[in-house]
Amino acid sequence: MSVKPLTELTKNLEAASNELLKTKVLMDMELNYLSIEQLESAQNITDFLNILKQTSSQYSTFIHQHFLFYLLKLSTFSTLNYDLESIKQYMNILNNVCDVATTIHATSSSNFLNNQTVINHIKQYITSNATFTGLSEPIVPNNVISTFRCVEEVVHVCFQCYWHFPFQAQIPQIPNGALEKWLLTQHFKFLNLDYTAFNSLKDQATYLITHEKHLFVPLSSSEYSLTLPLAKNQALNIYTSFTTNTITKSNVPVLAFSAKELTDATPELFFLYDFIIEALYHEHSYNVPQNIIEQFISKNTQFMTDLCNTIQIKCSNKSLTSSEIRHIKELLESCGLTEECCHRLQTSVLISNVSFTSNSWKGYETFISLISQLVLFSDFFYKCLFYFSPTSIGHSKITEILNTVSAIESETLSHANKFSWKLANMLSFFIPKAPSKIILETYTHISPYLMKSAFSIWAKKTWNYTWLDATSPHPTQTHTFKHAPVISQSEVQKYCENLQLGTTEYDSRIVNSHLFAEEFITHHIIPTLTAILQNKVQKNRALFQLRWLIVFASDEAKGLYRIRRPLGLLYFQIIEIFHDSNAAAAAILNVLDYLNEIQQLIQYYVPTYTTPIKFIQELFSIKYKPQSTELSKSIQKFIAETETCVKDILPFIQLGTNMCNTTYYHIENTYNINIQGQSPARLDTKALTHAIKAIQGLTKESWTTISQSYKELQTAYIQLATILETIEKISQHSIAIKVSNPNFIKLNNTFLQCFKKYNTIANLITNSHSFNLTRYFRQIFEPELIPITTVQKILNFNDETDDPQPFLDSLSQPLYSHTNAPKKSELTSEDFNRLLEFANPVFETAPSSIKLHYSDTFNTPQVNINWKTYEHTTYIADSPAELQFTHLTSAILDAELSK
């Protein structure tokens, strides 16, 4: 819906040459917004009312008498911010509009909607919110102004401000170790909590860099630039706090961990350790013993299980108070599961698949599944919380979010989210309830059926409220025509036959007849509507004709009220589809419902009438073809990116497979490698380990790109799932239309094929040798079971003077179980050449930066110059020699050379 200034509405009304065109302007405005800032001008409102006086329809008269209700119902603020200063500005604007309206006189027959009542309600709302600070729950008006767009916007931003409340829960303040202290201090700073009890961030960063050097691993950027971005960012934060100099991210190592950090980590602060989650997700253990990793997994799995149980109990209620919602938010934030943490884990870690079958850590699958479940829940919890308010704005936004959740949990995408939770059900407490009483009262006090139709569409679109038509009283024929003059049917029939489409003048005597409705329906509504629905009329002409059917003799032709109500709804819905690319998902379904109601009313007079569908078919295409095009582009993009990445990754997979099926002979720091048709090649251990890391890293980088593309495809499929749900309802409607163009069923099958291909590719890549190359060559990366120095000490052991502890420490290292090696083959010369490309990097690590420090002191004896002796700054010889110059020509040069 677009925003228009009141001056433009006034200008369009003034330009309209007849009653019908003026009504069109007012009707079209019902589907747009007005800029509320223009209502602060009395002149703008007065000009609008003066032009409105020139029309005499019931519709325009009602607007003139209740102009504040009409204008504020459609008014919106130009910008919306959820800070206290902005909220005060919005209140001031509302107050100014009320002050201006007070100076403009208008008579009204409705106490519920009259201008003074509206002014009183708004003034009362402004007064009640005068002390709003964002700490207490905002006040919500419980009267007609809650249906005004501008008032809903103020209520909504107040709630947005309220949900950004200061954190008040308790967090463990005794960290275990220097690293946890750093993470906790960072967390306190992010939550705007007092962290003065800890050392400054600079002091902590200095301590970590100087005393905990084992935490910083200078891995190559090609290996971990994509697979460990969180560890990189954590290290960057520490280095940034350590120095004020500019830090180059590519030169910063990644933040790692040892057995001590895993043992000391507090489970209640688990999600502060996002870099550990990232490392374990990608199975980087940094040589920490398996039993230590499994203990870490076990204690944090227990913590997450308890957290899940608490959340599930709290979300089991269909409605929660604000304090209960606040408590869930604090529960998540206290363990580090903030909105930003969810985003980091979603985009950097959980986006890629993880293989549970190849991992040997006990409890690993449950551990990762709980992380995924909590992150997904928290992500959508924060999204819902941001939009949560008891307004139609909140209802629309949250319904859209939960539809997305339902699509994610559909059978198609559930393979990636095998959770026991149904998030859409758990988060349903966020959906605000419609203010039914206020909507019904407002609808009842609106007298023009055109405005009733527009209000009904608003209630259905914003609140999904569909009870208005069922509960609204309609005038009966007995009551309406009790005092109508007796006119013969032939006279009414002749009048309708001669009535020209588009005329605005009418015979009151005839249109008040109880026979007029049947004849008007027979001679005008049926043929006009049939021509429109057969798509025989140009679009603008069709809208004009439909509008005329609605407004002709609208003030007196009471017998047409029942059929004009769905005609009005149909008109507004068609306008929305034509002019709004983001029209409601159920727009076509609404059109079918309105046409079905019109058909039933017509069949009362003409039982054989059926609704043509050609025009509806075109509406279906207008509504859904752009979406079909965008979804097709998403598929094409996924296929293109995946094909490119697979093409790039296949050589690595082939090389990794060949490497794992080749025999290696280790001699000191060198490996002999069998080459087909050649003598064995030699490669030093350092070069081989670098090649292994590089091949695995590049494989994972390509896989991360595929996973990112798949994530985008999932997002597109969520949109398709919502469309398919609506189209399913359309296909089952009593007015049957074809839903095969655009063919979303075919599109859905294409998506499913892409998902199937992705799963196949995922299994092939994640279970390939190159993806897990460091695991296959883990012996190279493991520490020696018994170092050479220890062996030498054993050989030269002296019972009296030597300590046996080094030997005992070596024996205490766990022995990893290795599978039997498969039958070995040999590398081809091409394979070995490619291996050498990765084994000999130009720069293995980034060079250390050279830092020079200067002062005003000399590091050599000061130079003393006797300026009385040295009177000149240039050298002057004591006895200048006389220099003789000869002009050299080519002739002289030739003569000299010929001598």
From Swiss-Prot:
Compartment annotation: Virion tegument; Host cytoplasm; Host nucleus; Host Golgi apparatus, Host trans-Golgi network
InterPro entries: Herpes_U30, HSV_ITP
Ranges for region Interaction with large tegument protein: 463-899
Record keyword Acyltransferase present: no
Keywords: Host cytoplasm, Host Golgi apparatus, Host nucleus, Virion, Virion tegument
Role according to the record: Plays an essential role in cytoplasmic secondary envelopment during viral egress. Interacts with the capsid via the large tegument protein/LTP and participates in its transport to the host trans-Golgi network (TGN) where secondary envelopment occurs. Modulates tegumentation and capsid accumulation at the viral assembly complex.
Subunit structure: Interacts (via C-terminus) with the large tegument protein/LTP (via N-terminus).
Protein name as it appears in the record: Inner tegument protein
